[in-house]
Amino acid sequence: MIKVSAPGKILWIGSYSVVFGGISHVIAVNKRVSCSLREIKEKDSLIFHTSYGHFKNSGNELINSVLDTFRERLSQLPQGYEIDLYNDKEFIIDGKKTGLGSSSAATVSLTACLYYAIHGKLDLFEIHKLAQIANYKRQKGIGSGFDIASAVFGSIVYKRFTDLDKMDFYFEKLNLGNYDMMLGFTGKSSETVGLVRKFVEKSNLDDFKEIMRLIDEENYMAIKLIKLNKLDEAVEHIKLGRKYLNYIAERIVGVKLVSKMEEELIKIAEEEGALVALSPGAGGGDSIFALGNDLNRVREAWSKRGIFIIDVKEDEGLRLESN
């Protein structure tokens, strides 16, 4: 039996700006999607058991995007296998996604499993390219691919590709280390693709481009300081970049990324010892991320307000569990 797993993610530097070619840092976390594959007697079949249902020979949109990519790019698809594709429980709470990147982790995990069945090894760059193609087509070109890259390579500095076939992305491994990290799930899911599309619609405006340039400058400086182990100083640049982002969202795009309740949760977290708290990824309401040396007081304060706490730790990228 082959078994692989891929991590969830937290995009805390580069939200939205990464879509337009800006630099980002994404943290791979220890909530994972596992995929296992074993041979069956039906040699012309693929049977899927997943967190979202059971399928034969084709599946949901995610599964089909991966299968189609294998047919198009490799001209072959392994047959005669039963496949289990399951999320850790924290990806979905009460039927709602928590923003940890279950779709990207599942795409990478399934891609890796099928690739291993064909080649008997894991080639991270080939798996990354196949998973990016499947994800890109499924999202109809919206998105930057940071989540797929992190699910393969772990915690990384990332700049998106400009060409899907060339896959001319930039990445650099950058682990944060042993900080206390958590997500506070607010109980509602955001619609990431819809939010990103609204930003794309305004992206040709001069004001939009100028403020995105300022955001990217702050993000570059934050990442430079993180590399020097100066997280306290980096946080100030992250916060300023966030102020610019909220300005674009509200004044130019016409959306509010952080609700009053989320603003209150961020304020509480920073008063109770978090080095930084923010709405990760595309924002829009699903979770608030907090990072610090000791977040116990934050956990207590958020829990009192009915927020579901998801403790996370930095984790590695795509992993072969057994073969």
Curated annotation (Swiss-Prot):
Its cofactor is Mg(2+). GO terms for molecular function: ATP binding; phosphomevalonate kinase activity. It is an enzyme of class 2 (transferase). It catalyses: (R)-5-phosphomevalonate + ATP = (R)-5-diphosphomevalonate + ADP. Its EC number is 2.7.4.2. Pathway: Isoprenoid biosynthesis; isopentenyl diphosphate biosynthesis via mevalonate pathway; isopentenyl diphosphate from (R)-mevalonate: step 2/3. The keyword rRNA-binding does not apply. Keywords: ATP-binding, Isoprene biosynthesis, Kinase, Lipid biosynthesis, Lipid metabolism, Magnesium, Nucleotide-binding, Transferase. Gene3D superfamilies: 3.30.230.10, GHMP kinase, C-terminal domain (3.30.70.890). Pfam families: GHMP_kinases_C, GHMP_kinases_N. NCBIfam families: Arch_PMK (NF040957). PANTHER family: PHOSPHOMEVALONATE KINASE (PTHR31814:SF2), PTHR31814. Homodimer. Belongs to the GHMP kinase family. This is Phosphomevalonate kinase. It comes from Saccharolobus solfataricus (strain ATCC 35092 / DSM 1617 / JCM 11322 / P2).
